[in-house]
């Protein structure tokens, strides 16, 4: 993302006063947000990835409040990215908007064979998230299982069931279905 594109994105966020499926806003004028893990996970686990915009305050109607220290913010966000599995490689862009510094972190999508991306400190079942609208929600056991079975090439609908045999089939029902 170029600085001018970040400026346009900031204008759009301020105009719509909303986050979205691919946009998360964090104030960051008093320091780096402590917990980005849920957003890092949810953006990494969707095909489109996402963008975290630092320097707008949602509680003030998405007012530009700036970033406390651009260099330190990028360093600390990268530290949080390194605590994900697989590691997230954010792409940073900075710009000045209405006299304050704004920073974005583009979070790329993780290849589906490596999903779910999760926070190592919480483990796969508690640290995996999915994005729904503007919310980062914990993945269900089923969602995690779906990714894991995809990786293992498990096709539950094609697996033979050892305890099943032809005597369990309703021959008349099958004939009616086929004919």
PLM regions: where:
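Conserved N-terminal catalytic/coupling substructures associated with nucleotide/phosphate chemistry
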Residues: 1-179
């Amino acid at each position: 993302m170029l600085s001018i594109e970040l400026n346009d994105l900031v204008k759009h966020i301020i105009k719509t006063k909303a986050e979205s499926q691919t946009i998360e806003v964090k104030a960051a004028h008093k320091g780096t947000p402590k917990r980005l893990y849920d957003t890092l996970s949810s953006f990494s686990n969707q095909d489109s990835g996402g963008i975290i915009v630092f320097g707008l305050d949602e509680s003030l109607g998405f007012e530009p409040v700036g970033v406390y220290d651009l260099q330190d913010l990028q360093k600390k966000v990268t530290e949080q990215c390194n605590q994900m599995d697989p590691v997230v490689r954010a792409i940073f862009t900075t710009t000045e908007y209405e006299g304050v510094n704004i920073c974005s972190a583009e979070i790329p999508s993780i290849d589906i064979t490596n999903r779910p991306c999760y926070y190592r400190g919480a483990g796969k079942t508690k640290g995996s998230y999915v994005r729904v609208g503007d919310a980062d929600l914990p993945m269900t056991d089923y969602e995690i299982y779906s990714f894991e079975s995809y990786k293992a090439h498990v096709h539950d609908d094609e697996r033979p069931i050892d305890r099943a045999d032809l005597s369990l089939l309703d021959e008349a029902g099958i004939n009616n279905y086929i004919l």
